[in-house]
Structures are given as structure tokens and as C-alpha cells.
């Protein structure tokens, strides 16, 4: 008899799990018997993350069930060309659409968020009845899940899963959003021993959560994949060499520099002079390693980004390329990172809920459908739902 049967669950629960950086190759190569059993008995596909393929953009998309043109989160880092000020995109004031927590509350449901990174809590927990981060845990969760873990370790993700289990077992929430951190994916390729151990232990913790609840619905996905980057490009230096002044923002940029050295596969370019637009476009299009160049209007339309929050250009790199501030315009680097189209593939799993994943193209489609499931029979998550497409 499982924990739920012993304690008397009030109603079925839903776990929305975003495993940061869980490239499908990690799933394929790892010993994860519980997840693979859920894949076999549930509904599974490999779908797409939202571009740019970074943490804030995709967590916001999953929490709101909307693309960035509606929710407003287009980067980890925001530059305002009118003021010249730069800030981390970590405040809820940037989020322009209701969260799943707010929607759940209107239906009389209790919701919670457990995350590794405190920035996810400050950005996305609006409306949650309970919100906790491993980075800055409250005393009650230290006693339940353990002392504050090292953010640059596998332990931080184990802490998140233990805290999630604690909340679900206490019957405090009907729906719980879980978000890990991708330090281990940045540090290790799928076949490396530390990665295999990390995911095997996460799988065991996931299995314990599922075993606790006879009717738990699980929606599991990732915010992006991961690739080895061997060539760095400093776009500001590339343009400056041709007499073009610009502010270049690596979209991956955040305070967790150890993860990725602020080097990622996508960047925004803000020109100092709009008269340089054509010249800059020609320079960038001729530079090896820059795979895609989209001017603001095209980028907003094609990738459903909020036009007034992106640069004059959106650049996407080749698979081996990362953009960022470097000592030279081009140099050899060694970092595992993401942000480009090459890190867009993500796993999409529905377990215990029953939707047809063939209709789910993007990770955010999981929460666009959430209250169409039987988990909360009185709820409708999205009226007139249609699968998203680009």
C-alpha cells in the first residue's frame, strides 16, 4: 500500500517537473528504470524547447503555458537600450501573463514551487501557496530535505526532489512545479560516470515520489539540451573591428558563471547607431560560426518573442559555437552550453494524465493542456486549445 492510500489523499495530484538541461541523449544513455517505465506506460515524445533555448525563457513558458511574445521573458539577462542599464531577468515584474499557480488558485487548488535556483522562485512563483529554493531554503525545508546544498554539485538536485516529496506527502499542494539546475549537464557529457550517477539517483527519487501517490499525474520535460562548445565568438569585437559600436548580450548570461562562463549559443545585438543596421548585417552574415541572423521584427515573428525586449539582431550559433565576452574576436573554448537551435530537442512525458503527446510539439504544450486532463475534473486549463506551431 502506497503512502497516499495510507494517509487518504484528498484528490489526485499533479507534478510538473522541469529537469534543467535534460537533453534526450541523457535519457537514452542513463540507467533510469523508473523514468523509462513511466515512458513505456505513459506517453512520451521528443519535442522542442522554446528559442532561445535557455532557462528563464523556458521555465516562464512552462509556468504560463505561453510563448515569450505573451509572457515577456526573452532572456536570462535584460539590457535596456534607452537607459543603458542591464539587469538579471529575475523579478516577477518582468512576467506579463498569469502563472499556473494563479490559475490553480482560482479553481480552489493549492500549488507549490520547489526549485534549485532562487531566481526561478523570484521570477515565477507568483500565486504559489508555497515556494522554496535550494539556493536559499527556509528552515522548515532544511529539516525536511537537508542543509543548504552546494549549488555547484549534484546534491542540489537531490535536495529539490526531497523537498518536493516532502510537500506532496504533507498533502499541502494539489499541483507542484519542480525545477532543477543543470550544473551536472554543463560539467559532464551523458556517458561520463558523474552524470550517470546523478541521473540514476534522481530517477530513484522520482520513483519514490510516484510510489507515494497512486494517482499522481506527472508532466516532465526540460528547458533545453546541451552541447560541447569549442569555438567562442565575441560579437562586439567582430563588429568593432569594422567600426560598428554595439552592446552584445549573451542570452544565457546569469550569476551562475561556473555553469557556462556566460558563453551560450544565442545573443542579442543592440546597435549604438541604427544607421549601421545594413553594414552590421553584412559583417555578421559573413562571419563563420554565426549560423542564423534575424533582425528584430523577423526574430519576434519567427520565434514568438516580445519585440520591445529583444535586440536589433538575434544571433544563433553553429552547434560548436558559443557567444560571449572574450579576449579576442574568435578563440578556442571548452564549455558545455546551450541557447541555440542545436539545444532545442527536449523530452516530453505525460504519465497518469492521458493526453496524446503526438499533439505536443513544444515543452510548454504540457501546461497548455494541463487542466484538460482527468487530474482536476473541474478545471479547464486553456479554452480552445490548439497545439502550438512555428
Residue ranges and their predicted role:
Residues 1-44:
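Active-site-proximal N-terminal segment of extracellular/periplasmic enzymes that hydrolyze or transfer
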Residues 61, 65-190, 259, 265, ...:
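His/Asp/Glu-rich, glycine-adjacent segments
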Residues 27-69, 112:
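Short, structured active-site-proximal loop/turn typified by the sulfatase FGly-forming signature C/S-X-P-X-R
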Residues 30, 53-54, 78-91, 97, ...:
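Secreted, luminal/periplasmic, and some membrane-associated catalytic domains
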Residues 15-21, 40-46, 54-59, 76-89:
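Glycine-/proline-rich flexible loop or hinge segments
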Residues 21-23, 53, 68, 118-122, ...:
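Short, solvent-exposed loop/turn segments at secondary-structure junctions
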Residues 11-24, 38, 62, 104, ...:
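Beta-strand elements within well-structured catalytic alpha/beta cores of enzymes
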Residues 317-371:
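Low-complexity, glycine/alanine/valine/leucine- and proline-rich hydrophobic stretches
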Amino acid at each position: 500500500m502506497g503512502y497516499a492510500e495510507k494517509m487518504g489523499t484528498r484528490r489526485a495530484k499533479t507534478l510538473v517537473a522541469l529537469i534543467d538541461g535534460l537533453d534526450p541523449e541523457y535519457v537514452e544513455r542513463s540507467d533510469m528504470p523508473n523514468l523509462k517505465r513511466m515512458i513505456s506506460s505513459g506517453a512520451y515524445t521528443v519535442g522542442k524547447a522554446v528559442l532561445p533555448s535557455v532557462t528563464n525563457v523556458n521555465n516562464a513558458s512552462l509556468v504560463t503555458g505561453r510563448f515569450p511574445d505573451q509572457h515577456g521573458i526573452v532572456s536570462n539577462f535584460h539590457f535596456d537600450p534607452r537607459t543603458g542599464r542591464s539587469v538579471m531577468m529575475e523579478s516577477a515584474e518582468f512576467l506579463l501573463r498569469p502563472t499556473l499557480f494563479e490559475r490553480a488558485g482560482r479553481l480552489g487548488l493549492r500549488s507549490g514551487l520547489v526549485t534549485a535556483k532562487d531566481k526561478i522562485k523570484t521570477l515565477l512563483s507568483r500565486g504559489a501557496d508555497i515556494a522554496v529554493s535550494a539556493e536559499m531554503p527556509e528552515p522548515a525545508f532544511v529539516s525536511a530535505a537537508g542543509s543548504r546544498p552546494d549549488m555547484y554539485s549534484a546534491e542540489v538536485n537531490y535536495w529539490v526532489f526531497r523537498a518536493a516529496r516532502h510537500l506532496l506527502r504533507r498533502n499541502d499542494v494539489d499541483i507542484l512545479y519542480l525545477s532543477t539546475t543543470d550544473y551536472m549537464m554543463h560539467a559532464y557529457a551523458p556517458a561520463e560516470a558523474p552524470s550517470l550517477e546523478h541521473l540514476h539517483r534522481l530517477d530513484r527519487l522520482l520513483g519514490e515520489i510516484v510510489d507515494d501517490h497512486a494517482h499522481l499525474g506527472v508532466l516532465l520535460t526540460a528547458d533545453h539540451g546541451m552541447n560541447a562548445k569549442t569555438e567562442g565568438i565575441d560579437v562586439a569585437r567582430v563588429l568593432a573591428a569594422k567600426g560598428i559600436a554595439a552592446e552584445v548580450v549573451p542570452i544565457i548570461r546569469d550569476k551562475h558563471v561556473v555553469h557556462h562562463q556566460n558563453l551560450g549559443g544565442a545573443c542579442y545585438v543592440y546597435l549604438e547607431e541604427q544607421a549601421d543596421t545594413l553594414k552590421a548585417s553584412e559583417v555578421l552574415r559573413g562571419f563563420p560560426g554565426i549560423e542564423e541572423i534575424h533582425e528584430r521584427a523577423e526574430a519576434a515573428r519567427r520565434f514568438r518573442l516580445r519585440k520591445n525586449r529583444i535586440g536589433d539582431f538575434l544571433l544563433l550559433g553553429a552547434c560548436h559555437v558559443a557567444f560571449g565576452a572574450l579576449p579576442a574576436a574568435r578563440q578556442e573554448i571548452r564549455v558545455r552550453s546551450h541557447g541555440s537551435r542545436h539545444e532545442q530537442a527536449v523530452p516530453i512525458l505525460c504519465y497518469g494524465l492521458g493526453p496524446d503527446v503526438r499533439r505536443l510539439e513544444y515543452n510548454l504544450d504540457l501546461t497548455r493542456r494541463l487542466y484538460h486532463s482527468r487530474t482536476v475534473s473541474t478545471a479547464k486549463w486553456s479554452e480552445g486549445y490548439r497545439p502550438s506551431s512555428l
